[in-house]
Amino acid sequence: MWWRRHASKVAVGLIGFFAGVWGVGVGEVPLFDWDEVNFAECAREMRVSGNYLYPQIGFLPFWEKPPLFFWVQAGFMAIFGENAWGARLPNVFISALTLAVLYYLGRRWHGEGFGLTWLFLQGVSLLPSFYARSGLIDPLFNLFMLLATVCGAYAVEKGRLGWALGMGFCAGLATLTKGPVGLLMPALAVGTLLLFRRQLPRIGVLLLGGGLAFGMVVGPWLALLLQSDGGKLLADFWAYQWRLFSTPDAGHGGPWYYHLVVVAIGMFPASLWAIGAWRLPFRKLPAPAQALLWLTAWTLVVFSIVKTKILHYSSLSYYGVSYLAAWVWLYHRRWIWRTGGVLTGLIGLLLAIGTLCVGVIMHFWPRWIQQIKDPFMQAAIQNTPLDWEGTEGWPGFVLAGGLAVLYLLPWKNTGRLGLLGLVCLLWEALMLRQLAGRVEAYTQAPLRQFCTEKAQEGALVWPVGFKSYIPFFYGQMSPDASPAVVGDTDLFQQKLLAGEMPFPVYFVSRVDRYKPFQEAHHLEIVEQRGAYVLLAPPYRGPGQAGK
């Protein structure tokens, strides 16, 4: 086939196409609370304070994450601005680079056709495409762990020190991106490969080379961190990591099978095809491919055990799922158009119907709004001036129509794969364009508007009764009007409520949580917008809101 003769050019074209699709409008919808806004604020505060050693929130040390991703984000913000564009564009480039890595690995292991198929299936699957448009840490974190695992597998297979150094280097970068899981997951995968292939004598090369490179990457940062605060930040960081493992932190609990469901739906259509890989000749695969599948298995096992259940925790498994789907497509295609084809059609039809129903359901919201028991959600829908015509879910027709064409036209297999991928990619892009802005309007737009409006007046907006990073980022918090002034966030809030700070301040809360603060501190309601209430203190201190 012509594409086999020009595989590298096709790969470059596909990667450019995906990057273009992901990049279009990536900054049009504001950043979402918590994670996107949290990470963008860490990068912004690095730029404002000039402190790049560790992340900050409220210009106080933020011990939940290491700094590497925020360095990258701060660099993009220097070019594209401190906004949604600057926060999300890094992942467009990182995800495009990831596709290039998958193509290279697939071609090296199984040939050009496999590399292109793996690249394509990863790019069109739902959650990888979604994360490419996000401001989250995980695309960069996962890429480093993938590279560390592959390098470690080659070290096991070839026994060369250079590959062990590569594993330690990439694991070190992963650790600087999000924490010790960046070392744990590649170590589990490569360690299992050592046992499976009975190459235990090569553990010395791995420990020596990997440990040396890991220490060279992470060691200087740890030394500077210890020198700066005597180890308190590191102690807080480890306590946080243990809390994530042992408790459903921040209310993010769930059943043990949570991530199995997430991967099954989030990796559509690749996940359905991957089911057919039960005939995979695992022992005949190259060592790095075996390590990748061990990495996938360990990801699902570890994060099914971890008490905190968050959507992107299992995102490291996506590489293995798309790898299995590519194998089934190339070597077990009969399963694709029998069982796999039926499953793809059924799930695709359900997704299409669900998309179509969104607009219809919201069009009739006055009929069912009283059935909602959550006062915040009820107020958000009732008080947000959004018109629903009932046709907003029209991208569902794109998915349903594409599936119909896929099954009715007598196209060749390559054409079918391309059509299915493009339909999924187009449906997701259109759905996000139609609905993401409306979700933001209900959930956080009034809060964001309060913060930006009052920031223009030179006032601080502070959240009470709920946690949000929006006042920090969209309120453009400055060091001299932040918790850093008193050295503690809780103390800062107490002083704000007591009127002891020398700058104008407003308070914002949810409609279901503001009354205790209003009554205890005699706050005045300035405005209710959507599901949020803007409050001002009654005192008349110098420069204070409510003056």
Predicted regions located by residue number:
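Membrane-integral, polyisoprenol-dependent glycosyltransferases
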Residues: 1-338, 390, 472
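Membrane-embedded architecture of ER/inner-membrane glycosylation machinery
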Residues: 165, 280-547
